[in-house]
């Protein structure tokens, strides 16, 4: 089974920052069970009311330590699933060096048009944005806040993003079973 802590960002009237940190405490928990990690994970996402788009436009902006083969495989899988990739300069350059097509968009501090403009316009379906350091976290606050307002699914870790993409194959196979069926 897979436990998932659910944070009520969509129901909250304040715009507290949804970035996960050590001080954040769980306000709810769901559990997904399945015969595989992918099935359990997708069920936990559904139980937490997290909308996972199956196609559309994904915004990618990842910190340098996440620019790995794992990230490249994730980008390739997104393209295979018919996602269009929009990325910040450093991420877009990294993808281009590895023959993965993406469109470039400014960070907020680089001027308009920037990523928050695209989120407001409804042009972004999924966000994968990993940050490192106080400045980077602060600079991406407006992205996270707008994602919450517009109900755009947002991942702040490469691991959760990869788990979600790995679980794609289970969208159509989700079934409800008794716990006794698993144990």
Model-derived regions, located:
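Long hydrophobic segments that form regular secondary structure
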Residues: 17-58
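A general structural motif
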Residues: 37-43, 62-66, 84-87, 106-116
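Short internal beta-strands
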Residues: 59, 82-94
């Amino acid at each position: 089974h897979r436990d998932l802590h659910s944070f009520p960002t969509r129901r909250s009237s304040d715009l507290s920052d949804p970035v996960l940190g050590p001080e954040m405490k769980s306000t709810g928990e769901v559990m997904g069970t399945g015969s595989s990690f992918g099935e359990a994970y997708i069920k936990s996402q559904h139980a937490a009311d997290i909308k996972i788009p199956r196609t559309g436009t994904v915004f990618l902006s990842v910190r340098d330590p996440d620019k790995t083969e794992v990230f490249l495989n994730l980008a390739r899988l997104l393209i295979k699933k018919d996602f269009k990739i929009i990325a910040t300069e450093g991420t877009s350059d990294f993808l281009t060096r590895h023959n993965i097509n993406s469109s470039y968009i400014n960070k907020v501090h680089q001027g308009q048009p920037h990523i928050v403009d695209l989120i407001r316009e409804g042009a972004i379906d999924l966000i994968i944005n990993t940050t490192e350091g106080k400045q980077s976290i602060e600079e991406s606050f407006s992205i996270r806040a707008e994602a919450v307002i517009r109900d755009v699914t947002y991942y702040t870790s490469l691991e959760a993003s990869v788990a979600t993409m790995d679980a794609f194959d289970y969208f159509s196979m989700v079934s409800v079973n008794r716990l006794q069926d698993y144990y």
